């Protein structure tokens, strides 16, 4: 017994439609009846588990897919290598997996000609490899050279792609070329705005846009960071990281204004009040959704202690005080 192309296509369609429960049932059935030399069903099963955030089962399925594909002369399953690379915590092994996936993608692109989806996959892989050389493999002698190379390759595919521009900005920050990083981030925001306006498939994922926010804060583009965060919040207001970053952005901006002596006392106070509001809101979301990251909770609590120590009022307290002062002034005017 073997699995048919039609069965595999149905699983893929379920995945595209986010019907993961149905996809899981079909993928398990397909994997059970797949011959030893066919890893396609296991590759899809791995993708389903990855979508369900079951990393352990995803890794097992992808490894089985790789094992069954060893003797194939024309392996077309690049996804298993890219996914395994993403969840591999060994930089050198992750690099080899990415390169294997890219090799397959490049071959498929030659066979199929112009294919936007394949190009996007290759571009994403190039960005991931560049990130590896900025993180896990940063101590290698040729790390900076390779980072430049893969970032350049990604931008050659599409110079307006937000993920590629984000990678460029991240690299420039690591090189202390802040103005060049800001330029890349400005172009990145233009790309995001254009994709959002056109409701395009080129709109970066929520996670990518959140990473872009962190870079914006790092280079002190606070207004742009706030605007992007507000947009992300409108998409989903139950994401803890967004509330935390809204607060962190205000807090860091207030610190910068104080250190540089560029802001008025009122402006700094307002930023710190906003930061406190966002941090309190973040704790509310934390409790509501049962988030399991104790680290971010501890940091928020630490920041709130600092703000309380500075005597920063809650927003409702400030509003009540303002209303009381207004009422008192009105009474004095009436007496006059």
UniProtKB/Swiss-Prot annotation:
GO cellular component: a single term: nucleolus
GO molecular function: protein carrier chaperone
One BP term from GO: cytosolic large ribosomal subunit assembly
Alphabetical list of Pfam families matching this protein: TPR_8
Annotated region (Disordered), positions in chain: 316-336
Domain of life: Eukaryota
UniProt repeat feature TPR, residue ranges: 39-72, 75-108, 110-143, 162-195
PROSITE patterns according to UniProt: TPR (PS50005), TPR_REGION (PS50293)
Main location: cytoplasm
Keyword Nucleus set for record: yes
Keywords for this protein: Chaperone, Cytoplasm, Nucleus, Repeat, Ribosome biogenesis, TPR repeat
Localization per Swiss-Prot or TrEMBL: Cytoplasm; Nucleus; Nucleus, Nucleolus
Function recorded in the entry: Acts as a chaperone for the L4 ribosomal subunit encoded by rpl4A and rpl4B, required for hierarchical ribosome assembly. Shields ribosomal protein L4 until timely release and insertion into the pre-ribosome is possible, once ribosomal protein L18 is present.
Family: Belongs to the ACL4 family.
Protein's name according to its UniProt entry: Probable assembly chaperone of rpl4
Native source organism of the sequence: Schizosaccharomyces pombe (strain 972 / ATCC 24843) (Fission yeast)
């Amino acid at each position: 017994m073997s699995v048919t192309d039609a069965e595999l296509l149905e699983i893929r369609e379920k995945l595209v439609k986010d019907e993961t429960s149905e996809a899981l049932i079909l993928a398990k059935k397909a994997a059970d009846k797949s011959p030893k030399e066919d890893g396609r069903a296991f590759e899809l099963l791995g993708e389903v588990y990855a979508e369900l955030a079951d990393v352990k089962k995803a890794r097992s399925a992808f490894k089985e897919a790789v094992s069954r594909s060893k003797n194939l002369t024309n392996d077309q399953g690049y996804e298993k290598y890219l996914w395994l690379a993403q969840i591999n915590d060994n930089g050198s092994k992750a690099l080899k997996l990415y390169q294997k996936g890219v090799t397959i993608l490049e071959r498929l692109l030659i066979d199929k000609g112009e294919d936007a989806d394949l190009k996007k996959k290759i571009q994403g892989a190039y960005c991931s490899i560049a990130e590896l050389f900025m993180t896990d493999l940063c101590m290698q002698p040729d790390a900076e050279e390779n980072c430049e190379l893969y970032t350049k390759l990604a931008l050659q595919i599409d110079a307006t792609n937000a993920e590629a521009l984000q990678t460029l900005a991240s690299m420039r920050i690591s090189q202390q070329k802040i103005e060049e990083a800001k330029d890349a981030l400005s172009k990145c925001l233009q790309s995001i705005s254009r994709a959002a306006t056109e409701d395009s498939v080129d709109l970066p994922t929520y996670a990518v846009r959140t990473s872009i926010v962190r870079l914006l804060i790092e280079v002190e583009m606070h207004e742009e960071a706030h605007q992007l965060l507000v947009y992300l919040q409108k998409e989903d207001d139950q994401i803890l990281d967004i509330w935390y970053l809204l607060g962190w952005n205000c807090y860091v901006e207030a610190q910068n204004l104080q250190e540089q002596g560029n802001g008025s006392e009122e402006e700094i106070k307002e930023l710190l009040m906003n930061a406190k509001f966002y941090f309190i809101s973040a704790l509310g979301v934390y409790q509501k959704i049962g988030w399991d990251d104790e680290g971010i909770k501890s940091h928020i609590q630490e920041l709130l202690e600092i703000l309380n120590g500075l005597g920063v009022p809650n927003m409702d307290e400030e509003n009540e005080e303002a209303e009381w002062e207004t009422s008192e002034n009105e009474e004095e005017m009436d007496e006059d």
